[in-house]
Amino acid sequence: MDEFHRCGKEDSFWQQCFLYPLFFQEDLYAISHDHYLDVSSSSRPMEHLSSNDQLSFLTVKRLIGQIRQQNHSIVLFVNCDPNPLADRKKSFYSESVLEALTLVLEVPFSIWSKSSVEGMNECKSFRSIHSIFPFLEDKFPHSNSILDARIPYSIHPEILVRTFRRWIRDAPSLHPLRSVLYDYRNSPENLQRSIIVVPRVNTRFFLFLLNYYVCECESILFSRLKRSSHSRSLTHGSFPQRTHFHRKIKHIIIFSRRNSLKTIWSLKDPKIHYVRYGERPIIAIKGAHLLVKKCRYYLLIFRQFYFHLWSEPYRVCSHQLSKNCSSSPGYFLRVRMNPIFVRTKMLDELFIADLITNEMDPIVPIVPIIGLLATEKFCDISGRPISKLSWTSLTDDDILDRFDQIWRNLFHYYSGSFDRDGLYRIKYILSLSCAKTLACKHKSTIRVVRKELGPELFKKSFSKEREFDSLPFSSKAAARSQRERIWHSDIPQINPLANSWQKIQDLKIENLFDQ
């Protein structure tokens, strides 16, 4: 596969026209077979791995020949499984062939994505100690409205196959993809017409399908937004499984005065900003309310025209950007804008300019966070910690790891806030709730748990030194972070609190449109 990648980089003819012969490569199915056994062996005991888990390459060739018939009324791979009554998702042949199909389709997509990233000089992503707050500081104060557009995952199989034809000219290589998509649509779990892209199905094929679908939506949308925007540039960024960060981009215009030899620099703010975290795209717009309505209408028409699907109106909702609060990556942030008065004086005393700018001071929203903790049964509505009864069946290490993960995510997100008193109040609630959960599990008291498990138990998970262990700072930087506002975001996945908050917001939006 690596050799084919190198050949594809040298000659685009290979990457677009000769994918179908790869389906008859025995090495390809050997790779997918080994990968399937590795995944299945990690999820089930060794005694469940039968001797029937062996791939017959002759059967695979016959399967590919039958795919050319395109009989979508027959469920694919059922006749090949040693146990026809087994679930199709757990079928050995379906998983192996699906893995091979994903490997073949990833070849042109990976080559195209690498070439597009290498050629994109306007905006490059990189890891930083700063979180999404630079985006909020630089972009949101210059915008007055935001569009929260959830990506629709309901799409017809044929439309999805036709989008692949834009990048893959080898038509026979798309026959297996078409058969798999129709097979999934006709399965007993999905007796609907167009439910295909499922973001929560943790398989390689559907993750690749989701990434391609989102990339296709954004690539077309960016080109249209750049044409419709009055600004020459459109800043955008994506925050998938891990949080990636983008450099602060400032568009500078240079002009000079005839009567002065000095050069004056002024900033030109783009009018449309796009950021996506997972499946939640956010578009920040600067303009009148009519422009916001046009953008919302354009997004709905765009999805209907290019993907032939109807999006519910609540999936693209517009909000007036508040000056004291904002929400991003599933978290809630309260902001205090402090005006700063700056006076500038030129050396030759030609003129004196007074500038008034706003400084964004984030504040920990203690009341909404306590409300979320109460919803997840970590405390009551007044903020008094209680035991998490649903976690008492777990081991002590699992309980500590879950509480520690929630605390570290919240600390990394809100550590740059102006006032940390509310943040350490959240730490007190989580640590005491963890102690009560362990005491409830062992049917004892908090004092007995501390005495039996040791005083170092909670210091390991909730210690103040642990907060800076994962920060890429030196000891001086760690000490300086005590008094300076430094953000560090290392959130591989959204914790249950953020998911709970997002569900509450979705219900509010749906109820608003139902009325």
Curated annotation (Swiss-Prot):
GO biological process entries: mRNA processing; RNA splicing; tRNA processing
Keyword terms: Chloroplast, mRNA processing, Plastid, RNA-binding, tRNA processing
Name by which UniProt lists this protein: Maturase K
InterPro entries: Domain_X, Maturase_MatK, Maturase_MatK_N
GO molecular function, one term: RNA binding
Function description: Usually encoded in the trnK tRNA gene intron. Probably assists in splicing its own and other chloroplast group II introns.
PANTHER family xrefs: MATURASE K
Pfam families attached to this UniProt entry: Intron_maturas2, MatK_N
Membrane-spanning ranges: none
UniProt xrefs under HAMAP family: MatK (MF_01390)
Domain of life: Eukaryota
